[in-house]
Amino acid sequence: MNVLVETERLIITEMTMDMAMDIHKNSLDEDTRRFVPDEVFETLEDAKETVEFLMSQYGSTDGPLVYAVILKVDDTNIGYVQLVPIGEGKWEIGYHVAKAYTCKGYATEAVKAFLPLMAKRVGIEEVYGIRLLENVSSGRVLEKCGFETFFEGEGEYHDGVYGISKSVWKL
C-alpha cells in the first residue's frame, strides 16, 4: 500500500486494482446516485477501468488525483478523497464515504488531512467545493474544513441546472 497520509482513524492511500470491488459496491447507494451520478459504477468492469485510469494519474500534477480512504481498525475501504481540475488553474475537492460509514466524521477527517498536503504538492492555493444545496452533509464537511461559501443559487451541476453552493478554501 502506497500511503499518502494517515490520521487517527484513517489511511489515505493510492488505489490499487484489488480495491475495484469495494469501489463498485460503495458507489451504488442512492445518495451517490443523487449527488454524484457520474461516480456510480454499475458494473465491476466499470470500476476496474476507472481504477486503472486513476492509478495512471499518480505522480502527475494534472489530475484527477483520487485516493482511497481506508479505516485503520479493520482495513475497510470506505470511500475516497480527490482533487479534480475544473479549469485553468482551478481545482475542486471531492469526497465520498460509503453510506454505512457516514455521519462519523470520516469525510471531514480525510479532507483535513488530504487537502493541505495535496495543495502544496500540486502547487495550488485555492480549491473549490461545489455541491447540490440539498446535500447538507457535504456542506457541513466543507464548512468544518475551512471552506467559505461565496455562491448559493441556480447553477450548472453535472448534466443540468440545479440549486448549488460554491465554496472556496485557501492555503
Describe the predicted segments one by one.
Residues M15, T43-E45, Y58, V161:
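A short hydrophobic/aromatic micro-motif that marks alpha-helical segments and, especially, helix-coil
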Residues D31-F53:
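Conserved GNAT-fold acetyl-CoA-binding loop/helix
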Residues F41, S60-G63, V127:
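Secondary-structure boundary/capping residues
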Residues L54-A68:
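A short helix-loop-beta-strand connector motif used in the catalytic cores of GNAT acetyltransferases and
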